[in-house]
């Protein structure tokens, strides 16, 4: 479990993670999903990262910084956080970004990692997600799986 990694490395409290159930509806199906939460520490040494990507508590993209820092490990973490396997490819939730930012991120994924991606409009007006196509899954898995916690392999469609 991710908690064990964080706890072993001194990134969180010793309090046992709280388990709760979330019911999600898709079409006519309602499924229960187990979720866990735990408290991580705040490290002042990481404050510069926060200041780089947040202004007045609002996330901002510094596109050149993203280009510089997005590597295989960062992509793995992005997918563990905001990615979801669709049965064929992976959808990355980018609905907090403008269309211009989403277009930049899509092109970055294509150029830097040689992934085939599309931009999809989601159910929220003027919001988009990035879809990594089925054709890119084998390559994507090969470059990010080494950086993923095994409990997150389901985000790649791996059981």
Curated annotation (Swiss-Prot):
<protein>
    <recommendedName>
        <fullName>Intron-encoded endonuclease ai4</fullName>
        <ecNumber>3.1.-.-</ecNumber>
    </recommendedName>
</protein>
<keyword id="KW-0496">Mitochondrion</keyword>
<keyword id="KW-0255">Endonuclease</keyword>
<dbReference type="InterPro" id="IPR027434">
    <property type="entry name" value="Homing_endonucl"/>
</dbReference>
<dbReference type="GO" id="GO:0006314">
    <property type="term" value="P:intron homing"/>
</dbReference>
<dbReference type="InterPro" id="IPR004860">
    <property type="entry name" value="LAGLIDADG_dom"/>
</dbReference>
<comment type="function">
    <text>Mitochondrial DNA endonuclease involved in intron homing.</text>
</comment>
<keyword id="KW-0404">Intron homing</keyword>
<dbReference type="GO" id="GO:0005739">
    <property type="term" value="C:mitochondrion"/>
</dbReference>
<dbReference type="GO" id="GO:0004519">
    <property type="term" value="F:endonuclease activity"/>
</dbReference>
<comment type="similarity">
    <text>Belongs to the LAGLIDADG endonuclease family.</text>
</comment>
<keyword id="KW-0540">Nuclease</keyword>
<dbReference type="Pfam" id="PF03161">
    <property type="entry name" value="LAGLIDADG_2"/>
</dbReference>
<keyword id="KW-0378">Hydrolase</keyword>
């Amino acid at each position: 479990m991710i908690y064990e990694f964080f706890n072993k490395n001194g990134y969180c409290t010793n309090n046992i993670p709280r388990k709760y159930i979330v019911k999600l509806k898709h079409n006519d199906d309602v499924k229960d999903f187990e979720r866990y939460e735990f408290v991580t520490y705040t490290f002042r040494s990481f404050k510069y990262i926060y200041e780089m990507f947040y202004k007045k508590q609002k996330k901002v993209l510094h596109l050149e910084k993203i280009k510089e820092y997005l590597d295989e490990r960062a992509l793995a973490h992005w997918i563990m956080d905001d990615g979801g396997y669709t049965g064929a490819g992976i959808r990355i939730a980018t609905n907090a970004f403008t269309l211009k930012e989403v277009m930049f991120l899509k092109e970055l994924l294509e150029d830097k990692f040689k992934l085939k991606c599309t931009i999809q409009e989601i159910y929220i007006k003027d919001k988009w997600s990035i879809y990594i196509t089925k054709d890119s899954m084998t390559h994507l898995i090969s470059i990010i799986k080494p950086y993923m916690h095994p409990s997150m392999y389901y985000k790649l469609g791996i059981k």
